Amino acid sequence: TKEKLTALIIAALEGRTHIVDKLLAKNAQVDAQASDNTTALYMAARNGHTAIVEKLLAHKAAVNLLAINDTTPLFVAAQNGHTDIVKALLAQGAKVDLQDKNGATALTLAALIGNTDIVELLLKHGAKVDHKATNGFTALILAAQNGHTATVESLLRNGATMDLQNDDGVTALMWAALHDHAEAVKVLLAKGANTKLKSKTGRTAAEIAKDPAIKEMLPAVSN
């Protein structure tokens, strides 16, 4: 077809294990790429088909081939919360800190969805905890922005720098305050987040916060 989808890629993305078995037995090309450079492994990883991922890895499928937007099987497994697949890919040498076109890593994507198990797996395999994706967003900022308190706690336990600012000067604390995530604000304050920092628009977390309960937690900072 125009998209160059092989029978193996289609079977892998649809989760048809018995067809994958038959095709592999007939020496199907494991790493054949579709027109967007995705492979059977990529599709199985994205769609959460763990058994197929394991079969493809046993047939030496390439774990670090770059597909559309410079993403890899590890990216899409992390992004979609497939913990067992992330584990299997890392065990087969998936590169943990590859970046996609947006400067994102598997870690920043896992933090964005608040999957603490995957965050911890990636960190255990040496992921850079303070990596900044496009616009300066770190895993901690993304977790705080989306109210993923358990992920925030995990990142801090694993050495994330609390007060890093993105390109707009906004910290994890400011993002949590802006989006009404009181629990995340509490955790960040308990760990000593700097309340005096200002964004590029000259505002502190207290000034950014809309929720009165959050405003109360944050000391007003005089100039």
Residue ranges and their predicted role:
Residues 6-9, 39-42, 72-75, 105-108, ...:
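Ankyrin repeat (ANK) core detector
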Residues 10-16, 43-49, 76-82, 109-115, ...:
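Ankyrin repeat A-helix N-terminal signature
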Residues 16-24, 49-57, 82-90, 115-123, ...:
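Ankyrin repeat structural motif
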Residues 186-223:
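Leucine-rich solenoid repeat scaffolds
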Residues 2-3, 35-36, 68-69, 101-102, ...:
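Ankyrin repeat start-site detector
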Residues 2-4, 22, 26, 55, ...:
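Intrinsically disordered, low-complexity polyampholyte segments enriched for Lys and acidic residues
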